[in-house]
Amino acid sequence: MAKTDLHLTRNIGIMAHIDAGKTTTSERILFYTGLTHKIGEVHDGAATMDWMEQEQERGITITSAATTTRWKYAGDTYKINLIDTPGHVDFTAEVERSLRILDGAVAAYCAVGGVEPQSETVWRQADKYNVPRIAYVNKMDRSGADFFEVVRQMKAVLGANPCPIVVPIGAEETFKGLVDLIKMKAIYWHDETMGADYTVEEIPADLVDEANEWRDKMLEKVAEFDDALMEKYFDDPSTITEEEVLRALRNATVQMAVVPMLCGSSFKNKGVQTLLDYVCAFLPSPLDTENVIGTNPNTGAEEDRKPSDDEKTSALAFKIATDPYVGRLTFFRVYSGKIEAGSYIYNSRSGKKERVSRLFQMHSNKQNPVEVIGAGDIGAGVGFKDIHTGDTLCDETAPIVLESMDFPEPVIGIAVEPKTQKDMDKLSNGLAKLAEEDPTFTVKTDEQTGQTVISGMGELHLDIIIDRLKREFKVECNQGKPQVNYKEAITKTVDLREVYKKQSGGRGKFADIIVKIGPVDEDFKEGGLQFIDEVKGGNIPKEFIPSVQKGFTSAMKNGVLAGYPLDSMKVTLIDGSFHPVDSDQLSFEICAIQAYKNACAKAGPVLMEPIMKLEVVTPEENMGDVIGDLNKRRGQVEGMESSRSGARIVKAMVPLAEMFGYVTALRTITSGRATSSMVYSHHAQVSNSIAKAVLEEVKGRADLL
């Protein structure tokens, strides 16, 4: 394939709530850009982008498939790398990874549902990574569709600056096409060619006034970003050319100052080509984004790399997937330099050189082999032995570490065991591979029971993992009931002297420390251990201080109540003493671990549980039952709003421990008419009576409460 100029490359993702039609829109993009000859429908389970079996069965997208496609716009052929991202909240990690490596995004909304809870989460994630966006309001053919209401919600809920650049012609079942406010023409799609052909006509007479009004608002908004346009706008708006509007809108979009708004109905094949045109027109190319910044692992100095093939290589591995035919595929984005098939590349985390045996550009899950992937491009490689999500790949002569990604900690765990003992190895091998692919999924062995416990972001997340074990690794599992990932905390400050002595002939062990242990300071935000060394006059030699710190850090993994990790703690090392012969680093480490156990038991230990932020959309008549049920689940209702389809939105904070099987219960209460979505919010202290019950169940020490 011919090499595309970098300014004609677009690395984009489609981000949205579940069911806003992300995958259907991606399918249409592939159809119109000529990559698929038959359109895949999500509800038939045949969508090209949803290539895992579970996705096709459940009709949701779990892994971000990356696809490369081309589109002609304004005389040039653009190369579009399209990343389809999941909208289900349990798979937030996938979204976070995709946004890290994109240059721009299309935020898709449902014309009926508008800005939904997950849309808000994803919007904030895109803000965090400075990803410019255009918005696409889908499902304009559905009853209750209202384009301008979604524009209003984007402003109110997301605090965005939406700028409609189209006006729909008709709505609901009469939705026929769009008025393009930049060209001031009407576009109608032909149903007989599945929307592949369309006609451009004059604006219908009954829409001329509305179109002029919205065009005027659009010009007023973009004039702020272009001085020449501003003058024309005040002198004579009719002299403003299409090129000037496009240039001003592009600048404003790339600076994240406005969000151009389009609409359509992907399922009914209307509006997708206009969306593709404006993806090319407004979203940034790799050259429009800032140079990527990383640190040199040898010197710690900051370095930046330009998006050019002549620079030293730097690339970020953003996803690892196991493919049945080629084995482990590593998806990466090349920021500078290039990666060639058959060459060696250095992994700055592991410090090892790896050979990239083959390179591919992906079309959903089919691979097209390529020889080289250059700066600004996205591709996948085979042949890496030791690689994790977030690793930087670079030249050995010019190592660099790009900023990696932070992922939330898992909140729910279940114990699993294979149905037959002989599958034990298969199970651990399968779990290890899945944990490599997904940073929000962890596997550990419970020290007390010896069970294997897998943890993830929610029930659906773990269901899919168990399902994949069965399909991909042929392991059938028995699973325990879900467990909540509790934490522990201390509430009081305690002073303590701990002496550790061991004399068993020959050299003994000796350490003596005086510490103050308590909750962290309010301004200490990062969690973990806040360690302060106040030892004067060398009473404890400098080389033993890190061992004391290490002892406390490792001890915090097991709380005194039931062995749950302690989230944060402040330790002030005040004084102590040592023995010139018997003291060593290990003595001080063990002494710190003992001090931790003794002090925490007296420091008012409490149990902390994960609290979830819940939103339920329910019909008015079921509202009382839904709230009554939440009260039974120890929920705190924080607010209620009306949605425009006559339903009510209930927002509440509810402990995760009370939420198992909630989806089924909600279905029963509302006869299947309500929907809910849940995101982890924070950990909060559990009341004494509930803490006692939890501790008795896990055989913890309820006597310390």
Curated annotation (Swiss-Prot):
Disulfide cysteine pairs (residue numbers): none
A single Pfam family it belongs to is EFG_C
Biological process GO annotation list?
ribosome disassembly
Which GO molecular function terms does the record list? GTP binding; GTPase activity; translation elongation factor activity
tr-type G domain location is 7-287
Q: Where does GTP bind?
A: 16-23, 84-88, 138-141
Q: Report keywords, A-Z.
A: Cytoplasm, Elongation factor, GTP-binding, Nucleotide-binding, Protein biosynthesis
Q: Which InterPro entries match?
A: EFG_II, EFG_III, EFG_III/V, EFG_IV, EFG_V, EFG_V-like, EFTu-like_2, G_TR_CS
Q: Where in the cell is it found?
A: Cytoplasm
Which GO CC terms are listed, alphabetically?
A: cytoplasm
Q: Read off the SMART domains from this record.
A: EFG_C, EFG_IV
Q: Which HAMAP family match?
A: EF_G_EF_2_B
Q: Name the job this protein performs.
A: Catalyzes the GTP-dependent ribosomal translocation step during translation elongation. During this step, the ribosome changes from the pre-translocational (PRE) to the post-translocational (POST) state as the newly formed A-site-bound peptidyl-tRNA and P-site-bound deacylated tRNA move to the P and E sites, respectively. Catalyzes the coordinated movement of the two tRNA molecules, the mRNA and conformational changes in the ribosome.
In which family does this protein belong, per the annotation?
Belongs to the TRAFAC class translation factor GTPase superfamily. Classic translation factor GTPase family. EF-G/EF-2 subfamily.
According to UniProt, the name of this protein is Elongation factor G
